[in-house]
């Protein structure tokens, strides 16, 4: 019988447990070793990444682009609050601040603002006392009490110009400049144990991981401020487990290299807090200016809580787009601050009653992406390989933030109306397939300085970065004033046009009949836009109604080569001596055409448009200053005669008269343009604006300039003349050698006392006014000069 040995069951169980424990320990050891090796591998691998990153400045000293300074003048309609807001936005602080701004300081009362530029100001350190009364600047005096005729405020920052072409706005701040309430608000809502943990809050991290598992999706949560900083500086925003490990590794390295205060300072400058136009708002310093129009040191409790609350989802909690959400989130932060003991419950409840008090949202200087692109290009041309980013240069430009806002608003408001016209036309033609909607460009400048004040290069920078303001297109009928200026030049020289017995004037009769020309062996038969022909018309009427055939007829009399030569002198390099040159068949950019029209608006002196005024080091040393280039192209008398003719375009039956119906009433001159594209060029005594509307594929827009470009121009100019700096428009003043005459509308002859009251004003070179009048049309038609020299016929031209 076999011997059976029975092992006690308890002993067997203990042995099994022992074996399992050994296996567990071995596995744990291996896991620990593997984890240590993995951690060591990642630590060593990413230490190099961190080292490389930290060898560079954490925040690159990018070049900063500034707008033009606002000029304040006695008698100007301007509120004290506007000046205060602009000084704060520019970075000026109260002189009693713990750390006054190096840009400058200011102090205000109910009736005055005392401005003192600092060592880093754009201007010299000469201060000014600006006094106000009833919404008007009553006086400006310097530091010695002497009166000033004007004073320029500190230019506003547009953007930082980074090497990777990213569009961010950031104002670097130090930890000492951050209000304690802002620090406590951020800690209360984002990382309450920030000053206690070593970079990773494992309790929150595991809770977030468990939440991911139970919900089946990867959500944010569990990250400390240091982890957020690690992610922002070194990693992409993708949500993967491996990235989280790397994030933790980098977090430990940051914690060991920097103090908590340094980490918070970096976080405060790095965190994204929304979007303004095409620019990202990064850091509390910039956010304080954007949302509240003040320096970060001046933020109150409610403002601190709002900014802290926006960290989680800045666009979702935007006080502009979602004010209710923003207020609710702000109040959540205030409750969190009560929980941490940062504020009392009574203080929090009182603060909750405050409205949002954010600055007016507008498309301001920060929304000039096409302008900024051109500035970047100009800097590259001017400075070559100069590393303006590394040196953190300051680039001062020509941009007027108020006017840029008006330009953008005019485009945004007008495009839907233009698109509707396109849709209606497509419906009438039963068009099938995709519809092409037109692009747009707007250029506004000071006609006396060439300063580009506003520029819009397209309907949406986000959709297309192609800058139509510098894209060449056929100029269409806005070219025609060059033809008439060429004709006035012949009068100035005392030269008769072929077949005429009197010098050219606005009353000269032109043939508006369809005519065939031969160009390079081929027939060219131009037609008027509406297919209507008027027979004999005055030159004034031909330009006022934009008659193609009459204008080409005049160009043929002057000489196509003469017209093309003047066009090239004015800046249209492509112009050639063909009949089509007279109606704008050759290309130029909207920016080019703005330069062309300065000659008409500036007494014949053409000024090249410019955008970069000065490039300086961070300490204020000048690297280069821009000097405008100009050339006298037209005689002042010819410039005025052309302007007077273009004033008529905006009156009565002129093609641009619609701008008056749209509410623009200031004295102005202009010209519509309709070829394949729609144009409008116009100016007052202090502002010139060109608008272009057309298709990228060069197809015919099929909308007149009066219905596509003119409404944008009118909308923009109405806003512009309402601004203090452009409100002082005046009538155009004739120079010496030009006289104004009342002309009878029926006979187109000088009016006398027996004529009807239906008259208009026309400008003439001295001595060229016809001697015949409305009541004596058969009188000697020769002008004064012709009578003296015995030339010409006594009968009027037919």
Regions found by a protein language model. Give the residues of each.
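Conserved structural-core and active-site-/substrate-pathway-adjacent residues in large, well-folded domains
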Residues: 87, 186, 229, 263, ...
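Bacterial peptidoglycan biogenesis and beta-lactam-recognition machinery
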Residues: 92-93, 178-181, 190-201, 214-219, ...
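Active-site loop and adjoining helix of the penicillin-binding protein/serine DD-peptidase-beta-lactamase fold
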Residues: 170-178, 251, 255, 311-329, ...
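Short amphipathic alpha-helical face segments that pack within enzyme cores
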Residues: 185, 204, 306, 332, ...
């Amino acid at each position: 019988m076999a011997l059976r040995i029975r092992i006690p069951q308890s002993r067997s169980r203990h042995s099994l447990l022992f074996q399992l424990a050994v296996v567990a320990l071995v596995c744990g050891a291996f896991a620990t070793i593997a984890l240590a090796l993995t951690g060591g591998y990642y630590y060593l691998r990413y230490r190099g990444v961190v080292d490389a990153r930290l060898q560079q400045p954490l925040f690159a000293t990018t070049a900063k682009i500034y707008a033009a300074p606002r000029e304040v003048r006695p008698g100007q309609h301007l509120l004290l609050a506007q000046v205060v807001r602009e000084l704060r936005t520019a970075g000026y602080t109260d002189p009693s601040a713990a750390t006054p701004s190096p840009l400058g300081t200011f102090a205000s009362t109910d009736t005055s603002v005392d401005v003192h530029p600092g060592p880093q100001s754009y201007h010299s350190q000469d201060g000014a006392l600006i006094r106000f009364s009833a919404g008007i600047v009553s006086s400006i005096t310097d530091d010695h009490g002497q009166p000033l005729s004007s004073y320029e405020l500190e230019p506003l920052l547009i953007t930082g110009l980074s090497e990777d072409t990213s569009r961010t706005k950031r104002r670097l701040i130090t930890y000492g400049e951050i209000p304690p309430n802002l620090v406590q608000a951020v800690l209360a809502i984002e990382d309450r144990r920030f000053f206690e943990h070593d970079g990773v809050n494992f309790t929150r991290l595991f809770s977030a991981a468990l939440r991911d598992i139970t919900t089946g999706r990867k959500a944010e949560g569990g990250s400390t401020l240091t982890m957020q900083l690690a992610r922002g500086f070194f990693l992409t925003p993708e949500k993967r487990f491996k990235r989280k490990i790397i994030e933790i590794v980098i977090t430990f390295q940051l914690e060991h290299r920097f103090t908590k205060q340094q980490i918070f300072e970096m976080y405060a400058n790095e965190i994204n807090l929304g979007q303004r136009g095409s620019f990202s708002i990064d850091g509390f310093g910039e956010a304080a200016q954007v949302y509240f129009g003040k320096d970060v040191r001046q933020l109150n409790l409610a403002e601190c809580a709002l900014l802290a609350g926006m960290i989680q989802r800045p666009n979702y909690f935007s006080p502009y787009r979602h004010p209710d959400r923003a207020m609710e989130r702000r109040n959540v932060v205030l409750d969190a601050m009560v929980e941490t003991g940062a504020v009392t419950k009574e203080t929090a409840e009182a603060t909750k009653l405050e409205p949002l008090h954010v600055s007016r949202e507008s498309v301001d200087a920060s929304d000039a992406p096409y302008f900024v692109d051109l500035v970047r290009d100009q800097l590259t041309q001017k400075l070559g390989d100069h590393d303006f980013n590394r040196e953190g240069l300051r680039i001062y430009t020509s941009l007027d933030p108020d006017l840029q806002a008006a330009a953008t608003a005019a485009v945004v408001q007008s495009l839907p109306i233009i698109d509707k016209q396109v849709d209606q036309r497509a419906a009438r033609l039963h068009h099938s397939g995709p519809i092409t909607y037109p692009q747009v460009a707007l250029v506004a400048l000071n006609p006396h300085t060439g300063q580009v004040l506003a520029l819009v290069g397209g309907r949406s920078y986000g959709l297309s970065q192609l800058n139509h303001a510098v894209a060449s297109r056929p100029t269409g009928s806005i070219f025609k004033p060059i033809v008439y200026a060429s004709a006035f030049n012949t009068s100035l020289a005392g030269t008769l046009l072929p077949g005429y017995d009197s010098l050219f004037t606005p009353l000269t009769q032109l043939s508006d009949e369809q005519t065939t020309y031969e160009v390079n062996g081929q027939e060219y038969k131009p037609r008027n836009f509406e297919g209507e022909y008027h027979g004999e018309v005055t030159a004034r009427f031909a330009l006022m109604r934009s008659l193609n055939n009459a204008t080409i007829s005049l160009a043929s009399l002057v000489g196509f080569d003469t017209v093309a030569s003047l066009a090239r002198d004015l800046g249209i390099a492509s112009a050639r001596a063909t009949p089509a040159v007279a109606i704008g068949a050759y290309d130029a950019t909207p920016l080019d055409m703005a330069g062309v029209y300065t000659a008409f608006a500036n007494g014949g002196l053409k000024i090249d448009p410019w955008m970069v005024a000065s490039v300086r080091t961070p300490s204020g040393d000048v690297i280069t200053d821009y000097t405008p280039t100009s050339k006298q192209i037209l005689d002042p008398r010819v410039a005025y005669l052309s302007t007077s003719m273009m004033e008529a375009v905006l009156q009565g039956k002129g093609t641009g008269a619609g701008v008056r119906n749209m509410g623009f009433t200031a004295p102005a001159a202009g010209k519509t343009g309709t070829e394949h594209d729609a144009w409008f060029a116009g100016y007052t005594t202090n502002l010139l604006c060109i608008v272009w509307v057309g298709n990228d594929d060069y197809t015919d827009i099929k909308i007149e300039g009066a219905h596509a470009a003119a409404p944008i121009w009118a909308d923009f100019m109405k806003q512009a003349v309402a601004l203090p700096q452009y409100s002082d428009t005046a009538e155009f003043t004739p120079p010496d050698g030009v006289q104004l005459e009342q002309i009878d509308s029926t006979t187109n002859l000088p009016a006398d006392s027996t004529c009807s009251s239906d008259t208009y004003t026309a400008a003439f070179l001295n001595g060229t006014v016809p001697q015949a009048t409305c009541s004596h049309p058969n009188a000697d038609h020769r002008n004064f000069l012709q009578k003296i020299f015995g030339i010409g016929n006594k009968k009027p031209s037919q």
